[in-house]
C-alpha cells in the first residue's frame, strides 16, 4: 500500500493539517485523544471532505480540490472497523458478515466466506443474534464483515479501546490476520504504544492536528521512555513453564525467569516495565528479587532525563531505564556487563 495525503480541514477550535507519504502493509496512527486521528481516517475513507488538498492511494486519486475529484466512500474500497462494533442488531452473525460481501462487485471477491469464518473462529456463532454476543465476539464479527467487503485497505479506529485488557490481547491475533492471512494492508489507529508495537511496523504520530513524526513502532516506544509513567514495556513471549516453590519457571535467554503470574500453558506473553528492572555493577550479596540476570549492554539511548539501557541476556533482549546520574555512576557503556534484578511479581501476563 502506498498513500500520499496532503489535506487540510478546519473546525471551530481545531485544524488538521496532514502532509504524509507512507508505504507498507501495517501502518499505525498514534496520538492522544482529540489529536485528530479519527478525523484523518474519516477523510481518507470519504466520510469527511477536506477543505483542500489531495489524497492518492496506490496511484489512484481519491480526492483533489484542484481537480474537482471526490470519490464516494463505496468507490474507494476502504473498509472500517470502529471502537464500537456498529453491527446490525436485527441481523444474525452470518447475515452481518455477508452484508458487505453481497455489496462487493464480483470481480473483487477474493476472500472465501468459510475460510474467514474458520480464521476468526466464528463457526459456532453464525446463527446467533449479535445482541447476545460478548464484546470480543462482536469485535470479531465486525472485523469479519469488514474483511468480507474485500477492501484494498482496512482502517481500524481504536478497535480495542472498549475492551478490557484480557480481551484486548485475545483479539489482537485476529486483527493481525487481516494482513497475515488475507493480505489486506491496514491503518491501525490507537493511543496505546503497546498496541502499536504488536500491530504495526511504521507509525505516524499526530499531535494537535499535525503530523509530527513518522517512525518505527519500536522507536516510538523508545522515544517516550522519559515521559511515560509506565516506561518502556518489554514484551516477552515465553514457552513451557514448570512450577518451582509456588512460582512459574520459564526458560529465557541464557537461563530462566521466575514469574508469579504464570501458567502451565505451552506459551504466554508477558509485559515487563523498564522501571521494574534494577541494575547493579557488581553481583549483589542478597536481594529479595527472585531474578538476577547477568547481562551485556548492547546499546543506550536518552529520552528526557532518562537513559534507556538495552540488555542482552543470551538471545533475550530487555530494556531497562535509569536516570542520567545513575548511568554515569554505573559507567554504562556498550559491551559492559550489568546484573539486572527483577521481582517475580513484576511480570504481567497479557495472553
Placement of each model-derived feature along the sequence:
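Conserved ABC ATPase "signature" region
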Residues: 60-65, 108-125, 176-177
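ABC ATPase NBD coupling module
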Residues: 62-79, 103
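Conserved ABC ATPase signature
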Residues: 129-133, 137
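A short, proline-enriched helix->beta-strand linker immediately N-terminal to the Walker B motif
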Residues: 148-152
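Catalytic Walker B motif of ABC-type/P-loop ATPase nucleotide-binding domains
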Residues: 154-158
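Internal alpha/beta loop-helix hairpins
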Residues: 180, 189-254
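Glycine/charge-rich catalytic "coupling/switch" loops of P-loop NTPases
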Residues: 254-301, 324-351
Amino acid at each position: 500500500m502506498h498513500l500520499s495525503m496532503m489535506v487540510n480541514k478546519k473546525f471551530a477550535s481545531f485544524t488538521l493539517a496532514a502532509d504524509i507519504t507512507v508505504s507498507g502493509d501495517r501502518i499505525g496512527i498514534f496520538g492522544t485523544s482529540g489529536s485528530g486521528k479519527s478525523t484523518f481516517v474519516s477523510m481518507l475513507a470519504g466520510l469527511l471532505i477536506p477543505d483542500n488538498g489531495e489524497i492518492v492511494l496506490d496511484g489512484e486519486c481519491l480526492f483533489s480540490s484542484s481537480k474537482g475529484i471526490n470519490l464516494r466512500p463505496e468507490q474507494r474500497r476502504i473498509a472500517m472497523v470502529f471502537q464500537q462494533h456498529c453491527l446490525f442488531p436485527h441481523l444474525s452473525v452470518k447475515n452481518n458478515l455477508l452484508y458487505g460481501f453481497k455489496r462487493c462487485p464480483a470481480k473483487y471477491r477474493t476472500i472465501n466466506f468459510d475460510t474467514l469464518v474458520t480464521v476468526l473462529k466464528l463457526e459456532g456463532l453464525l446463527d446467533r443474534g449479535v445482541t447476545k454476543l460478548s464484546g470480543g465476539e462482536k469485535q470479531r464479527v465486525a472485523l469479519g464483515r469488514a474483511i468480507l467487503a474485500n477492501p484494498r485497505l482496512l482502517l481500524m479506529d481504536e478497535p480495542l479501546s472498549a475492551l478490557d485488557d484480557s480481551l484486548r490481547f485475545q483479539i489482537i491475533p485476529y486483527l493481525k490476520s487481516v494482513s497475515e492471512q488475507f493480505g489486506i494492508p491496514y491503518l491501525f489507529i490507537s493511543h496505546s504504544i503497546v498496541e502499536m508495537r504488536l500491530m504495526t511496523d511504521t507509525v505516524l504520530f499526530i499531535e494537535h492536528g499535525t503530523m509530527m513524526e513518522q517512525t518505527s513502532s519500536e522507536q516510538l516506544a523508545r522515544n517516550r521512555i522519559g515521559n511515560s509513567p509506565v516506561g518502556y514495556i518489554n514484551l516477552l513471549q515465553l514457552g513451557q513453564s514448570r512450577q518451582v516453590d509456588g512460582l512459574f519457571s520459564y526458560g529465557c535467554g541464557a537461563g530462566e525467569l521466575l514469574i508469579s503470574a504464570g501458567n502451565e500453558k505451552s506459551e504466554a506473553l508477558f509485559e515487563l516495565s523498564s522501571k521494574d528492572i534494577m541494575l547493579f555493577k557488581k553481583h549483589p550479596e542478597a536481594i529479595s528479587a527472585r531474578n538476577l540476570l547477568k547481562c551485556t549492554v548492547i546499546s543506550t539511548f536518552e529520552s528526557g532525563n532518562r537513559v534507556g539501557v538495552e540488555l542482552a541476556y543470551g538471545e533475550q533482549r530487555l530494556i531497562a531505564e535509569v536516570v542520567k546520574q545513575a548511568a554515569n555512576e554505573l559507567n554504562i557503556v556498550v559491551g559492559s556487563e550489568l546484573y539486572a534484578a527483577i521481582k517475580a511479581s513484576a511480570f504481567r501476563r497479557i495472553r
